A protein has these predicted regions:
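Acidic, low-complexity intrinsically disordered tails
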Residues: 371, 377, 593-636
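Conserved SAM/AdoMet-binding glycine-rich loop
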Residues: 24, 55, 59-60, 339-487, ...
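Glycine-rich beta-alpha loop elements in corrinoid/cobalamin-binding modules
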Residues: 37, 56-251, 258-259
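Terminal amphipathic helices with adjacent charged low-complexity linkers/tails
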Residues: 61, 190-238, 262-265, 292, ...
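Conserved, mostly hydrophobic/aromatic
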Residues: 165, 273, 308, 333, ...
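N-terminal pre-triad scaffold of radical SAM enzymes
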Residues: 25-28, 289-316, 341, 349
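Amphipathic alpha-helical packing elements
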Residues: 158-170, 560-604
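Flexible glycine/acidic-rich beta-alpha junction loops that bind and position SAM and/or redox cofactors
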Residues: 84-93, 141-143, 173-178, 203-206, ...
């Protein structure tokens, strides 16, 4: 049986070690599961013979907390964890969140803001010359100069502010092994400038071969057009086959150099990574706190792929995992599934089989495997490329094998399907089997908006494509003799969304007959195309000027429009309708969003009625849900 990696000096000594090779410092609790980057990288290093100690969520107020193992032989590895620490701590409205799913018992406050910078500087206070290598999503998406939403300014590469030596960006397996081998052979960290998938600092460009010179930090900080230009260059250099080396000047501080991305893992390499001896659980020291909430959903889920060629503008995957699909073999996934069924808490349900996009199981075209993805076109947007290979046969086969396993009652697909890709496949077997076997009443899909103007900036297919998918999904349900519904996710205040577009979305929600309980407001996180548009007001790939709803008040209005029935939102909804010139939606008609303010008899009070208020003196109207709404529509 696997044992957890050392988290204390005693653990280290119990293994007979005098010193660890690497100390991995992470902002997450220690969960030894393949869905956690800390576990993958540390287990991979262990498999190559390196000794790794883990310091999960050290007390950043005490430098002693970083030194529990003493000085590592080769270096410190630093990550904020599975999530960016600022996204983890703050809502899009910049309010403190109440729960941290990656901490014991969901407790908030066990990691600092900007965890990577804080941890790195903490290390430097004690270990002045020990190599420090950054990894994980926080460091990866801040590897070059970037707009920071929380401070509303352009910030340095995280390599500058952290005092670290290297960034291993992206998924990191290839680069971390190459870095470890270089350090182990005695190469100074300052000389490790050749590893794909890394970022390093240098004084000048004399040893950098044919770099692409990005606008300097001073330029992108002062000029939004320069920022957009820099982002466009970086966006077009995210493919390991075609990307160049990029250099960003920091004046007297020298340069930050980004090497091309590491090559994607082969299927054999993917299988090896997921076959490492993970315990599959959180460390027992968290038992007293009730465990780690983030593990609950993924404990009985299976990762089948990495990468995504969907290229949604608001998603960071292009910068982090890349557009080239990488998959595990059926044998690897089935082996993990069988092991999962033997867990004492397994109830017969596999919660998910997927990745960034569940139904991607092969590269979008054969060209990707040898020449990379196209620099100046997308695979699915605005329409599927003529070279796209849309085929679900492999995924269908995998799901069938999983359904047939002993002890498995049902296999869910919850990580989301790309509905335009489903439609691009002429074979309807996947959609039919998805409806029949892998949905439980509701299928969550992400059309994001209904305005084609907004969808264009989002990099999403037109609304007509989504409506076609709904019709096909309905056919699949009828064929299976089931009554199931698609539950859409929508996003408010994305760049390009004027108040008129927001009202258009509210009208669509009205016609659906339900009110979303939660609304996803666009969150400008580092290194997404949408964030570049948000900050600059420019589409970086076209140079087009883009309207941006920026103020907290306007964002609140757009969010309120999607929840217009909530009485608390009435004034915001009314203001939004006035701005959009849509006062026709204030009244008593069936299509109206809110009723006008009505003066009560006998005094000066006003009644503020949100929604259409179909209730009467005999009682309130029944609550409208997706299920009863569809039932009523069918009865008409």
């Amino acid at each position: 049986m696997s044992q957890f990696l050392p988290v204390t000096k005693k653990d280290m000594e119990d293994r007979g070690w005098d010193q660890v090779d690497f100390v991995y410092v992470t902002g997450d609790a220690y969960v030894d599961h393949s869905s956690f980057g800390t576990a993958i990288i540390s287990r991979l290093l262990e498999s190559r013979g390196y000794k790794v100690g883990i310091i999960p969520q050290p007390d950043w107020r005490r430098k002693e907390s970083i030194a529990i193992f003493g000085e590592p032989r080769l270096g410190f590895l630093v990550s904020a964890g599975n999530m960016d620490s600022m996204v983890n701590h703050y809502t899009v409205a910049k309010k403190h969140r109440q729960k941290d799913s990656y901490s014991p018992g969901g407790k908030m406050g066990l990691r600092p803001d900007r965890a990577v910078i804080v941890y790195s500087n903490l290390i430097r206070q004690t270990f002045k010359k020990t190599p420090v290598i950054l990894g994980g999503i926080e460091a990866s998406l801040r590897r070059m100069a970037h707009y920071d939403y929380w401070e509303n300014k352009v910030k340095h590469s995280i390599l500058i502010d952290s005092g670290a030596d290297l960034i291993s960006y992206g998924m990191g397996e290839h680069s971390i092994i190459e870095i470890a081998e270089a350090l182990d052979s005695g190469i100074p960290v300052s000389e490790i400038t050749y590893v794909a998938g890394t970022v390093y600092k240098c004084r000048d460009l004399s040893r950098t071969y044919e770099p692409i010179i990005l606008p300097s930090f001073d330029e992108v900080q002062a000029d939004k057009l320069a920022y957009a230009r820099s982002f466009a260059i970086q966006y077009q250099n995210t493919d390991p086959f075609t990307a160049g080396t990029m250099a960003e000047s920091y004046g007297t501080k020298g340069y930050v150099i980004q090497n091309p991305p590491a090559l994607p893992l082969t299927q054999e390499e993917m299988d090896d990574v997921y076959d490492l001896p993970y315990v599959g659980n959180y460390h027992p020291m968290y038992e007293k706190d009730g465990g780690i909430p983030a593990l609950e959903e993924i404990k009985f889920s299976l990762t089948s792929n990495r990468g995504c060629f969907g290229s949604c503008s608001f998603c960071a995957l292009t910068f982090h995992q890349g557009r080239i699909l990488q998959t595990r073999s059926h044998e690897s996934i089935l082996k993990e599934a069988v092991h999962m069924t033997e867990e004492k808490n397994f109830k017969g349900y596999i919660h998910d089989v997927g990745g960034p996009t569940a139904d991607f199981r092969q590269p979008s075209c054969q060209k990707q495997l040898t020449r990379g993805v196209c620099k100046n076109r997308h695979c699915l947007f605005p329409e599927p490329c003529k070279n796209l290979t849309a085929d679900h046969k492999d995924y269908v086969s995998l799901l069938r094998k999983l359904r047939d396993l002993p002890k498995v009652k049902k296999v869910f697909v919850r990580s989301g399907v790309r509905f335009d890709y489903v439609l691009a496949d002429p074979d309807k077997t996947f959609l039919n089997e998805l409806a029949k076997y892998h949905v439980s009443g509701q299928l969550r899909v992400a059309p994001e908006h209904v305005s084609n103007q907004v969808l264009k900036y989002m990099g999403k297919p037109s609304h007509e494509v989504y409506e076609k998918f709904l019709r096909e999904f309905d056919k699949a349900n009828k064929k299976a003799g089931l009554q199931q519904f698609a539950v859409p996710y929508f996003m408010s205040s994305h760049p390009g969304c004027t108040m008129k577009e927001a009202v258009k979305l509210a009208e669509y929600v009205r016609d659906l007959g339900f009110t979303p309980e939660q609304v996803q407001d666009f969150y400008p996180t580092p290194s997404t195309l949408s964030t570049c548009m948000y900050y600059t007001g420019i589409h970086p790939l076209t140079g087009e000027k883009v309207y941006v709803p920026k103020s907290a008040h306007e964002k609140a209005i757009q969010r309120a429009l999607m929840q217009y029935k909530n009485p608390v939102n009435r004034e915001l909804v009314l203001e939004g309708l006035k701005i959009a010139g849509r006062m026709d939606l204030v009244g008593y008609g069936e299509k109206c969003l809110i009723r006008p303010v009505r003066k009560e008899h006998g005094d000066n009070k006003y009644t503020e009625n949100a929604g259409r208020n179909r209730g009467s003196k005999h009682g309130p109207a029944p609550k409208k849900t997706i299920r009863n709404h569809h039932t009523r529509k069918k009865q008409k």
